[in-house]
Amino acid sequence: MKKGLLLLVASLVSFASINSVAAEETTSDTITNRSGVVIPIEKYNALKSIYSDNFMNYMTQEEYNIIKDKDLSKVVIKEITDANLNSSTSTIATEHTTSSKSLRIINNGGYVTMSLTWYRVPTIKKWDVMAFRKNTSVSMSNYYIFRQYYLSTSNESKLSTEKYGQNFDNGVGATFKVQNGSDHEMELSADFTGSGRVYGSYQHASNSKATLADAMDYTLSGSGFGGVILFNEAIESKFDGMGGVYLTL
């Protein structure tokens, strides 16, 4: 059941480079990222071996406090790739072959990050959805964060955290507008405790008539797309049905 419905958090920030600029400031023994988080270089390098440059650039102090003392030797990473847009399936997998986009999920001691990287510019840029679904044996904190990184049409690197969030008893979802531009990477992170599975899914609106209302019309279910996102049957064909990812805590 839904516990909360609409949450709109808007932020659009320019930054120097998605791929090449790792931090605002470097000293002999620390790095300060663009969110102002001061990280020892040894810790920064260890985390960078797990997370993307984008994540490291904009990791918040709250996120850093959650993950800084985790045992990185126990980090689990799974990835799927998908080339078949409109493949109406609820497949949950750990590997596919792709020319379009890749979905990755990281478990760092219960702090789970799911990221979607586009290998080519999506033709349709409407309202997409990212969501986590959890087993009943797993608990989730109220803290979660969504980010979208991209290059604008003027070739300027951008960060957007604009989303409509939905909280459910069995997880959380974020609906967001795909921004105009290229080199898109979307990211959803949340903190979990307990033992059991956490499932992740990204669903792209592959129909130009998809609306915000369509992209909000879902619940979380194992019978949904990617084993997570169950759209209203009347509008589910507007989304691409990409397979999902999962991790066992």
What does each model-found stretch correspond to?
Residues K3-L6, A10, N45, K70, ...:
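Intrinsic-disorder/low-complexity peptide segments enriched for small residues
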